[in-house]
């Protein structure tokens, strides 16, 4: 369904929005990786769940494919936390099936936070109970 939602999208942030299915798959694979620090499981689960919430902070029903920018931002945030907790990006690389290097993608998304989600970071984190981070 996610791939169908973004299929053919060529609008704003399309180069990043096209990464949404791959980021989602990486999050699901991380849950099965025994190297994932246990403390990271709730964050990974939150990122997965956020993709399926119909009325998240930037809802796809209202904004179309550009509504995935908050979902991809959250995945990048969680991926960065996983790197910090595990001490290496290896776990991400091992679970990544995208063409673009995952660490580069995560960095770009985080660097473009304001452009992608504006001032909505705090609301996104509160929505999923991660406002302490």
Role assignments for model-derived ranges:
Residues 1-39, 77-133:
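Terminal, membrane-proximal amphipathic helices
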Residues 24-25, 42-43, 56:
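A generic alpha-helix surface/boundary motif
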Residues 32-52:
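Transmembrane alpha-helical segments and their cytosolic interface motifs
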